Amino acid sequence: GLGFESLAEHGKASDVCLKLFCYLWTMDRFEKYEDDLVDRLVVLCTGRGLMDGMLLSSPDITAKWESLALEYSGDAVREFNAYPEVVLAWTAYIGMAVACWWDKDWGRYKDQGYSSLVGPRGFDDLDEHVTRDILKHPLNSKEAADIAGNLAFLAGDAYSFMMRQGAEPQSVDAFNIFRHTLSAMYRVGAAIELKALRYRMEKI
């Protein structure tokens, strides 16, 4: 793995991660990595009927990730070594939730934080809370099962892609790859939901 064990020791993962995010956020040397990963995931999503060959987006949704990432980073770092693909899939669920909020009433939901995305068990049932309470799909529905299956597939591919970068564990490069992978999964999750809500790109 990318070796975040030392960050998670003694319950200090959140504080350390917040500082790292603030310090590293302006670094852009890994933007091409993120773009390449997004392009790859768009192809996979299109093959599964989740997209039409392009990444739907909105400036509001994209900008919202920065504040959510600062809150989410503590849980993401703590859980990543044991459950890397879960962390990546959960990030896509967050993107789907924000896209749903944006569609429903952005003025009402734009200030919602990470705590609004987790269920009674916190990080552990984020997927169920988003699916049932935000996207409004019963947990036993085909829609819920399809979302879970698709996001698990995409998370697995994204994890393989990030591992192939060969970053040294616990290095700055490893952390940058990690944060850009989260950003990519968020953007892809949002685009999947926008497509499900029947948005589409149009020439102007």
Predicted ranges, named:
Residues 1-10:
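Short, positively charged low-complexity motifs
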Residues 17-204:
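Intrinsic-disorder/low-complexity detector
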